Amino acid sequence: SPHAFRLNPMEDSIQEVIQATLELSANGELLQFEDVFANHSIHYDITHPYKQLLIKSKSRVKVYSCPPDSHSPIMRRSQIPLMWMPWQRQMMLPYLLPPELPETQLRQLTDLAMSFVKRNDSHLIDSLMDINKKIYEDFSYVQGITFLETTAFDVFSIRKGVCQDFANLFICLCRLIDIPARYRVGYIYTGGDYENKL
């Protein structure tokens, strides 16, 4: 069975990877590559039957000081709209498509997304931070009022939901201003058989 792993931390001007290891309990064929987003990636094809697959990833990184609100001089200023080479756009297309919603709802959400871009002088990071701040400040965390079928527009309208709803709204707004975004689900195993280890 084939598997894809993207577990290595990114290395850039504010983070250095000292060591990164990946241990897999089942034998298979391993191919390492860098994907279009510059992620260190591993394709692992397990060719023999197995009863259990244990994945152990360990990383040690050195993080250099950079205040979270200071995007320069280390981080270059990126402007919206972002410019993509045709092959990059092709690779990112699944992460650029907005959700299937009525046109009137998409227009409202697009207007909202563009309001952040305009008020931040088209600065990429500042616009994204502003969207995040707005969701954090203006939306209430309320369990049990949304479902898997709840759309980004529904969340925008009721201003309530849970983490997944806020993430989906953020992703939708990003895509409407041509910033690739996706939702990933994962977990961290912390060991032990007692509750609330995290």
What would you call each of these model-derived segments?
Residues 1-82:
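Intrinsically disordered, low-complexity N-terminal segments that are enriched in acidic
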Residues 33-37, 65-70, 157-160, 171-183:
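Short, surface-exposed, charge-dense and proline/glycine-enriched linear segments
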Residues 44, 95, 139-141, 166, ...:
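Aromatic side chains
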Residues 11-13, 28-30, 50-52, 67, ...:
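A generic structural micro-environment signature
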Residues 133, 165-198:
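Hydrophobic/aromatic-rich core segments of domains that either
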